[in-house]
A protein has these predicted regions:
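Single conserved hydrophobic/aromatic residue that forms the stacking wall/gate
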Residues: 1-12
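Alpha-helix C-terminal capping/helix-to-coil transition sites in glycosyltransferase folds
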Residues: 7, 84-86, 112
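Glycine-rich phosphate/diphosphate-binding loops that line cofactor/substrate pockets in enzymes
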Residues: 13-24, 82-84
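NAD(P)-binding Rossmann-fold cofactor-contacting core
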Residues: 25, 33-71
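Short glycine-/small-residue-rich Rossmann-like dinucleotide-binding loops
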Residues: 30, 92-97, 120-121
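Short glycine-rich, flexible loops that bind phosphorylated cofactors or substrates
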Residues: 33, 96-101, 124-125
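Short acidic low-complexity segments
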Residues: 73-86
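ADP-ribose/adenylate-binding Rossmann-like module
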Residues: 107-137
Length: 137
């Protein structure tokens, strides 16, 4: 959904931050939670749209094989350990991996002043640091 990418760009503008070269962790790329099916998923389009804006996108999904995503959509998946020092975290699909296993670690991936975008309003915003921002649809 290009609107989501533009929305993130608008949030950045209001904060006086440039999206160019910002590190954005995009988490959960499949069609729905806890499955490996990418058919009908808008996530690859969102990742590619953010890249067009000049963002450094660190895509992660525990259910997708890296090779398949590269071949199909031209997106390289990153390891969970690479999700650090992020200017923004964009959770598109809240897999249990993020909600349960990495719930607390997820908020620590953000820099001070970072933006946490929770598309499906699945996370407890009170877990964010005081200078981090929360945004959801």
């Amino acid at each position: 959904d290009p609107e989501l990418s533009r929305g993130l760009g608008d949030v950045y503008k209001r904060q006086g931050i440039s999206i160019v070269d910002s590190r954005i962790g995009v988490l959960g790329l499949t069609f729905k939670e806890n499955v490996s099916d990418l058919r009908n998923s808008q996530s690859p389009m969102i990742v590619n749209e953010l890249k067009k804006y000049g963002a450094k996108v660190l895509a992660h999904d525990p259910y997708i094989s890296d090779q398949g995503l590269l071949e199909t959509h031209g997106i390289e998946l990153t390891d969970w350990q690479d999700q650090k020092d992020l200017d923004a975290v964009l959770v598109l699909v809240p897999h249990d991996f993020y909600l349960k296993e990495k719930r607390l670690a997820l908020f620590k991936t953000l820099k001070a002043g970072g933006i946490f975008i929770d598309v499906k309003s699945a996370f407890d915003r009170t877990l964010l640091g005081g200078n981090q921002q929360y945004w959801s649809l």
